[in-house]
């Protein structure tokens, strides 16, 4: 039901979208709805900040979800750095390294994520990302994660984002609103 309402809201505002800029921005704040494997719902905040024209950017995020039918919360936060290397006027090769922390009802796990991917602008209003990551932590074996995402920009500042992460242990879906600057 929640997904249907989100999809309906997105479709309703698409005709009113203004022309947006096609420059890829690595400075943004974002609020997301989070769905973990269809078994947990929650919300999150993410952001990034470009360090001038160097190609480097800092990134961070926090999300929380409650497992359906329980009072068990899953909290995660990450802090890291990334680098974007232009491979064409509308596409960047990106690499990221981040520290991750996950807390499930008092069980804390520290880890890291190393990612490489491509982010590109398909049109002035639409961009996509494909990323491969290796994630490892204290008490678990490492895992590879594939990420596919997109952003539809209403204006140079505002856009709607969606992302799906696929791993051996499950999927994570996010839909949110992004303000780029």
Where are these regions (language model features)?
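Outer-membrane beta-barrel proteins
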Residues: 2-181
């Amino acid at each position: 039901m929640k997904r249907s309402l989100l999809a309906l809201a997105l479709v309703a505002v698409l005709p009113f979208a203004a022309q947006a800029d096609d420059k890829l921005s690595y400075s943004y704040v974002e609020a997301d709805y989070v769905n973990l494997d269809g078994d947990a719902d929650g919300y999150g905040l993410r952001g990034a900040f470009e360090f001038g024209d160097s190609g480097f950017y800092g990134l961070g995020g926090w999300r929380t979800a409650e497992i359906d039918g329980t009072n068990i919360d899953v909290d995660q936060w990450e802090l890291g750095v990334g680098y974007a290397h232009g491979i064409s006027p509308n596409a960047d090769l990106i690499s990221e390294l981040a520290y991750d922390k996950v807390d499930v009802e008092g069980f804390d796990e520290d880890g890291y994520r190393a990612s490489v991917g491509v982010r590109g602008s398909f049109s002035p209003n639409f961009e996509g990302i494909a990323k491969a990551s290796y994630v490892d932590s204290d008490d678990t074996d490492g895992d590879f994660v594939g990420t596919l995402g997109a952003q539809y920009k209403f204006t140079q500042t505002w856009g709607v984002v969606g992302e799906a992460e696929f791993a051996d242990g499950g999927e994570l879906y996010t839909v949110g609103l992004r303000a780029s600057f």
